[in-house]
């Protein structure tokens, strides 16, 4: 097979050989076992001005004229780019379905070799060669290897392949019609290639593809069906009004069906729509005379974040439209740019968005025949997203797409021109217009569009300067990087052997050298960017972008331990790092900074003292409010965040759900906003939309709640959880429960299915440290390439998915005496909460209990002291020393403060001896977040205070009660594991039970006490559902009640 390929390559012109080479590269990139005609067709279609793309555009244009009437005939001269885009997506899906090469076959062919050519492709190439010989009588007398196959014959032969025809039918294209158009373009007499042109020194063929439209031939063709022939005749006759886009809009509105125009284009649709609306009163058509234009874009854009409210507002438009119809006889709904419908990361696919589309469809169906029209505009990418997320929108809204190009030129010429220009903004110039990869994720925030791409040239003044220390470190790493690159064998290509012809020499040495140069340049840019950001973050001598308009003098002085794993690229051991700037903080005042003139060099010093009395109080209060809840180290970390408002909103939402892990919430918010703005870690392939976070440490409930909050805030949906071996005692989140559709599928199949269903979701991979070697390798490659294969080898692009990898691994240096106690308490809390238990109210003899050992002096209940000194009073028995005993004598600090005091003098090195996740995973994730052990003391105090308040509100201060230790433990565990509020439960469940008991028993004179205990019994249904929640009722253990 390889010998056949080398022979056939000699018979191809340079253009055809280049197309075949691109197809083989695509097959190799996708790790396919063979190069098929599908790869060649995809490579031919990817060229913006290629022959196949132009022919497909002409075929789509001819097919659409027949249903468009005379008004649309003028527009038929250039097909809409979305037609070819749909064909590209179909080819991409077909390539994704092809199986990947087996490991043994890949090793046999070699790492750098291209996949072999399939039998179907060899047959297509031989058909093209035979057709080339038959088409030129002079070529029939030449040797077989002397006949050079032109690109046109290669395209025609590829279109004859059954697999290519099937894919084109899926995209509503006819391969016979496309082939007929190409043959018509070749029907004009042209000189046959001479023998001299077929030598090895021949230049490009005379029939190279041209971006100009293909000429139409008047001769009939057997491949062209009568409908397409009639459509081509109408198009060749030319319909009037093709050059006036505003006239096209009015003509569409006068049609009996598909009468609501949507103007699609990357430049000019808004101006065309305004011109059409201006012409409506003076158009001279009775149907449009006196129609009232109702602008809705501004109102709908305000509701873009709340699709449910948008659907309700559209439903309320019925009364307004009915009133305007009675007054004016006609209404034109100006919907404006449709980006309000698909704006946001997950808004396009939400139920609210579908409801908005359905409500607008019902409104137009109700009044459509009575004189109501809808007009709107959309960019090409926006319209494509509308068609993807709302496939039935065109039919429900009765839309008719009107392509708009710059300057009124045909849309095909405008799209091709913008694709050929370096800065073109046409749809063919976007990243989604190429097949490698087939479908790149779209940016979801305007900030991502404004961020300069990696490797872009910037002026030295625009880049932050580095101090001498960081510059020296940067130069040392740069020299080491260049030395490693020089030592690689690929950087020293062998000299070509002059005795062999060019087609037998190694042709990939130059390509490898260019790839190495590009990779080295990207590595240098990334290294420089890393050191500039590091210097700007930890050294105050370098100014940063004014993301925070707050002087560092107002920052909180106490530095906490950074709650994330800072993995240095190329370091042998990943470490938990502290900011070195906290070792010797500066104490210089900032008065000189504020009084320095603008032209003087600015130096920001960290000040650990209060502002001078002369500071403006209003400015100081405003700064304190903006920095409330953030520590000094966190402010230093987020100093480079461009979208500070989004960071604050995300941090607030995460902290409200998991208040005891505020440091982890701050680190998560910072890395998410940085990645969404384009400054995340680039894993060898440039900036991508997917994100990888690693949650390490204990507190499984905190991780689960953090993931829930992150998914609701970023994707407006529940997270998808795939368990690779996590703790089964915790209730599942997201949709990880039993599902009939998941039977027979592996865990990776579930991940790929979730990505296909929603490319903007949050996916949790629990127990990532327990996966096998195969799954570990696939996840690692997904981090590097942005594509994840399923069990059948079909790859899926990761889109804008946020992946959260969780593990219970705890760094060795966090395992101190106090931390070990907290970990044991968390384990016991999980075991007790997962068991069957019930709360019970009873009356017993009053006994003086010793004070709970876990209570500190400052939180000892006053009512307990009252009971010890008098027979009447409030008795609170809380013997809860087991879960949170502080082994440090005289220490009553929380876990965070204790850990900080133990770790302030050095770094927390993560040793390889611990069962840590793989070092490759640590180096590839965007960030690794450390969750600290949970200190349940604040939880217990909150629960006991709330329960005490309910008892006292019913019984008053003259009676005694006691809460059992196990009861408090179980209630604390339920509050920790669920989202339930203890205050709501105590008011609606516990208080009625206390009132019932108190009003139905005799009140003894202080000799009896009411007790709230936890008993092991068959558990009642839980408050709010689940199995870890608080009980829906509290039983009363008294006879007759």
Curated annotation (Swiss-Prot):
Keywords: Repeat, Stress response, Transcription, Transcription regulation. This is Protein SMAX1-like. It comes from the Eukaryota. One of its GO terms (molecular function) is ATP hydrolysis activity. Residues 891-900 have a biased composition (Polar residues). SUPFAM superfamilies: Double Clp-N motif, P-loop containing nucleoside triphosphate hydrolases. The keyword Transcription regulation applies. Residues 482-495 have a biased composition (Basic and acidic residues). Coiled coil: none annotated. InterPro entries: ATPase_AAA_core, Clp_N_dom_sf, Clp_R_dom, P-loop_NTPase, SL_signaling_regulator. PROSITE patterns: CLP_R. PANTHER family: CHAPERONE PROTEIN CLPD, CHLOROPLASTIC, PROTEIN SUPPRESSOR OF MAX2 1. Residues 12-98 are annotated as: Repeat 1. Residues 189-205 have a biased composition (Low complexity).
């Amino acid at each position: 097979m390889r010998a056949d390929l080398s022979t056939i390559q000699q018979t191809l012109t340079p253009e055809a050989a280049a197309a075949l080479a691109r197809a083989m590269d695509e097959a190799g990139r996708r790790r396919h076992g063979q190069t098929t005609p599908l790869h060649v067709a995809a490579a031919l279609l990817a060229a913006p001005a290629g022959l196949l793309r132009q022919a497909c555009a002409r075929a789509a244009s001819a097919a659409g004229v027949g249903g468009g009437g005379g008004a649309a005939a003028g527009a038929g001269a250039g097909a809409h780019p979305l037609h070819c885009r749909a064909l590209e997506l179909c080819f991409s899906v077909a390539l994704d379905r092809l199986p990947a090469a087996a490991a043994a076959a890949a090793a046999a062919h070699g790492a750098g070799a291209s996949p072999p050519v399939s039998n179907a492709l060899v047959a297509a190439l031989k058909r093209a060669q035979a057709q080339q010989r038959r088409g030129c009588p002079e070529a029939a007398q030449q040797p077989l290897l002397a006949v050079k196959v032109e690109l046109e014959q290669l395209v025609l032969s590829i279109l004859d392949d059954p697999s290519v025809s099937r894919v084109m039918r899926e995209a509503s294209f006819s391969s016979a019609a496309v082939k007929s158009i190409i043959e018509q373009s070749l029907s004009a007499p042209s000189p046959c290639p001479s023998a001299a042109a077929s030598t090895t020194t021949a230049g490009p063929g005379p029939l190279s593809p041209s971006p100009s439209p293909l000429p139409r031939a008047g001769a009939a063709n057997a491949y062209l069906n009568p409908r397409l022939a009639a459509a081509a005749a109408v198009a060749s006759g030319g319909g009037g009004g093709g050059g006036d886009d505003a006239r096209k809009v009015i003509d569409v509105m006068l049609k009996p069906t598909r009468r609501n125009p949507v103007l699609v284009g990357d430049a000019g649709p808004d101006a065309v729509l305004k011109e059409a609306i201006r012409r409506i009163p003076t158009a001279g058509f009775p149907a449009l005379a006196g129609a009232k234009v109702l602008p809705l874009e501004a109102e709908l854009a305000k509701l873009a974040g709340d699709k449910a409210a948008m659907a309700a507002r559209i439903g309320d438009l019925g009364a307004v439209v009915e009133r305007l119809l009675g007054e004016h006889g006609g209404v034109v709904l100006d919907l404006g740019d449709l980006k309000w419908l698909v704006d946001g990361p997950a808004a396009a696919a939400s139920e609210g968005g579908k409801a908005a589309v359905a409500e607008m469809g019902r409104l137009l169906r109700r009044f459509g025949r009575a004189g109501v029209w809808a007009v709107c505009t959309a960019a090409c990418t926006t319209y494509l997203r509308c068609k993807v997320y709302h496939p039935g929108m065109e039919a429900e809204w009765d839309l008719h797409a009107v392509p708009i190009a710059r300057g009124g030129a045909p849309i095909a010429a405008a799209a091709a021109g913008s694709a050929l220009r370096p800065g073109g903004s046409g749809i063919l110039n976007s990243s989604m217009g190429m097949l490698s990869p087939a479908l790149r994720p779209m940016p979801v925030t305007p900030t991502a569009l404004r961020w300069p791409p990696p490797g872009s040239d910037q002026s030295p003044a625009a880049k932050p300067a580095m101090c001498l220390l960081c510059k020296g470190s940067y130069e040392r790493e740069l020299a080491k990087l260049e030395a490693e690159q020089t030592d690689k064998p690929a950087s020293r290509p062998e000299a070509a052997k002059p005795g062999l012809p060019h087609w037998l020499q190694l042709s990939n040495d130059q390509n490898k050298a260019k790839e190495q140069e590009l990779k080295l340049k990207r590595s240098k840019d990334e290294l420089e960017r890393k050191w500039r950001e590091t210097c700007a973050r930890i050294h105050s001598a370098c100014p940063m972008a004014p993301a925070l308009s707050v002087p560092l003098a107002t920052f909180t002085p106490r530095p906490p331990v950074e709650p994330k794993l800072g993995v240095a690229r190329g370091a042998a051991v990943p470490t938990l790092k502290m900011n070195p700037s906290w070792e010797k903080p500066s104490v210089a005042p900032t008065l000189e900074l504020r009084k320095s003139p603008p032209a003087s060099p600015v130096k920001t010093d960290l000040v650990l003292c209060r502002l001078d009395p002369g500071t403006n109080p209003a400015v100081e209060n405003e700064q304190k409010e903006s920095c409330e809840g953030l520590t000094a180290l966190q402010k230093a970390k987020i100093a480079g965040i461009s979208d500070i408002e989004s960071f604050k909103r995300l941090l607030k939402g995460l902290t409200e759900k998991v208040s005891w892990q505020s440091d982890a919430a701050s680190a998560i918010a910072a890395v998410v906003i940085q990645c969404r703005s384009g400054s995340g870690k680039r894993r060898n392939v440039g900036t991508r939309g997917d994100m990888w976070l690693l949650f390490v440490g204990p507190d499984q409930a905190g991780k689960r709640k953090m993931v829930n909050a992150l998914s609701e805030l970023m994707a407006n949906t529940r997270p998808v959880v795939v368990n690779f071996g996590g703790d089964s005692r915790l209730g599942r989140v997201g949709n990880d429960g039993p599902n009939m559709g998941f039977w027979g599928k592996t865990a990776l199949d579930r991940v790929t299915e979730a990505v296909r269903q929603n490319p903007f979701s949050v996916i949790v991979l629990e127990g990532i440290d327990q996966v096998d070697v195969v799954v570990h390798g696939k996840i690692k490659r997904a981090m590097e390439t942005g594509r994840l294969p399923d069990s059948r080898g079909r790859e899926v692009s990761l889109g804008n998915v946020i992946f959260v990898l969780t593990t219970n691994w705890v760094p060795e240096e966090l395992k101190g005496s106090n931390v070990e106690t907290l970990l044991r308490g968390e384990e016991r809390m999980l075991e007790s909460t997962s068991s069957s238990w019930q709360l019970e109210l009873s009356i017993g003899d009053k006994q003086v209990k010793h004070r709970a050992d876990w209570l500190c002096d400052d939180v000892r209940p006053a009512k307990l002291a009252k009971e010890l000194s008098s027979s009447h009073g409030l008795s609170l028995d809380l013997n809860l020393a087991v879960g949170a005993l502080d082994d440090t004598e005289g220490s009553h600090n929380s876990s965070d403060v204790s850990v900080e005091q133990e770790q302030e003098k050095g770094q927390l090195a993560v040793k390889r001896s611990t069962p840590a996740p793989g070092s490759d995973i640590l180096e590839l994730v965007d960030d690794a977040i450390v969750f600290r052990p949970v200190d349940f003391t604040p939880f217990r105090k909150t629960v006991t205070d709330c329960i005490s308040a309910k008892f006292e509100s019913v019984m008053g201060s003259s009676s005694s009660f006691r809460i059992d230790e196990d009861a408090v433990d179980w209630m604390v565990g339920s509050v920790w594991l669920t989202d339930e509020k203890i205050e709501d439960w105590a008011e609606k469940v516990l208080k009625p039970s206390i009132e019932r008991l108190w009003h139905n028993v005799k009140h003894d004179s202080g000799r009896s006490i009411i007790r709230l205990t936890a008993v092991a019994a068959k558990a009642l249904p839980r408050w709010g559902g689940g199995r870890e929640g608080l009980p829906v009722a509290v039983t009363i253990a008294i006879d007759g009640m």
